[in-house]
């Protein structure tokens, strides 16, 4: 990795460290308006679709799932080099390629909001859970805040890498089932998601104890956010056990 820096050179600058020209895309206006717009679209589309028939989104979803698989694979692969410094890359250098792909990951969270649009178009109201909306209207906000503070780097890569890897598995499943096939490993996917959040909680604890690059406030944000997702997914998993195995949030 070229032109890597110590974390101190990036922290507190109030900007992306290596790509400051991208700052407008993580400004407070962009973050707040982008996520408020998501909630507005959810409200409006629910009203519009209430008196309409469900739309056939089969072909659109095949294309969408293929694109999501490719994007997730690209992010997971390009964010994997820091793994050679240990799973969590504790006290790792801040490098431009990590920041770039973490920015791509942040942008992908807006693309992921199309999951909700497809759910509403198909009138799958049972999939529009609190967990679904909560996740989509917070995850991009958190990554954007890290980016705008120059902290989307170093050991922070882990959250984006594991999320991209899990999304690769998830969208592969949705593509497979959208083509009419059955996935015998479906029951594992919610467990893999919960493992992801558990590892992110462990990551936050280890960063607090062993890494001096991030303050306690940032570590608590990661810990509490992933703990909230773990609790919500666990509740979803327990409720779905009696109904057969289910997977949260994506339209098929």
Swiss-Prot record:
Record-given protein name: Fatty acid elongase 4
Family per record: Belongs to the ELO family.
GO cellular component, one term: endoplasmic reticulum membrane
GO biological process: fatty acid elongation, monounsaturated fatty acid; fatty acid elongation, polyunsaturated fatty acid; fatty acid elongation, saturated fatty acid; long-chain fatty acid biosynthetic process; sphingolipid biosynthetic process; very long-chain fatty acid biosynthetic process
Pathway the protein contributes to: Lipid metabolism; fatty acid biosynthesis
Superkingdom classification of source: Eukaryota
Alphabetical UniProt keywords: Fatty acid biosynthesis, Fatty acid metabolism, Glycoprotein, Lipid biosynthesis, Lipid metabolism, Membrane, Transferase, Transmembrane, Transmembrane helix
Deleted gene: phenotype: Genetic disruption in bloodstream form parasites reduces elongation of arachidonoyl-CoA.
Naturally occurring in which organism (per UniProt): Trypanosoma brucei brucei (strain 927/4 GUTat10.1)
Catalytic reaction(s) noted: (5Z,8Z,11Z,14Z)-eicosatetraenoyl-CoA + malonyl-CoA + H(+) = (7Z,10Z,13Z,16Z)-3-oxodocosatetraenoyl-CoA + CO2 + CoA
Catalytic residues identified in the record: 135
Subcellular location, record wording: Membrane
Transmembrane segments: 25-45, 60-80, 100-120, 127-147, 150-170, 187-207, 214-234
Residues carrying a glycan: 56, 89
UniProt KW Lipid biosynthesis keyword: yes
Motif HxxHH motif per record, residues: 132-136
EC number per UniProt: 2.3.1.-
Keyword Signal tagged: no
Topology within the bilayer: Multi-pass membrane protein
Molecular function terms, GO-annotated: fatty acid elongase activity
Function, as annotated: Involved in the synthesis of fatty acids. Elongates arachidonate and other C20 polyunsaturated fatty acids (PUFAs) with a preference for n-6 PUFAs. Not involved in fatty acid synthesis up to C18.
InterPro entries: ELO_CS (IPR030457), ELO_fam (IPR002076)
């Amino acid at each position: 990795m070229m032109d890597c820096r110590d974390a101190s050179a990036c922290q507190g600058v109030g900007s992306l460290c290596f790509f400051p020209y991208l700052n407008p895309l993580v400004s407070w206006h962009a973050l707040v308006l982008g996520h408020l717009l998501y909630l507005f679209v959810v409200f409006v589309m629910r009203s519009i679709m209430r008196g309409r028939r469900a739309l056939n989104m089969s072909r659109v979803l095949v294309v969408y799932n293929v694109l999501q698989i490719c994007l997730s694979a690209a992010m997971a692969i390009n964010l994997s080099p820091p793994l050679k410094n240990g799973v969590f890359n504790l006290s790792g250098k801040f490098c431009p390629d990590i920041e770039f792909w973490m920015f791509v990951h942040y942008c992908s969270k807006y693309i992921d909001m199309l999951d909700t649009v497809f759910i509403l178009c198909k009138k799958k109201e049972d999939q529009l859970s609190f967990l679904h909306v909560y996740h989509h209207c917070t995850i991009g906000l958190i990554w954007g805040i890290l980016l705008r503070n120059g902290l989307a780097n170093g050991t922070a890569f882990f959250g984006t890498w594991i999320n991209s890897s899990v999304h690769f598995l998830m969208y592969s499943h949705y593509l497979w089932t959208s083509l009419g096939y059955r996935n015998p490993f479906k029951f594992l996917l919610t467990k893999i998601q919960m493992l992801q959040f558990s590892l992110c909680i462990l990551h936050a604890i280890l960063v607090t104890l062993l890494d001096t690059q991030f303050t306690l406030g940032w570590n608590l944000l990661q810990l509490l956010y992933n703990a909230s997702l773990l609790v919500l997914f666990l509740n979803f998993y327990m409720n779905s056990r009696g109904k057969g195995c289910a997977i949260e949030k994506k339209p098929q």
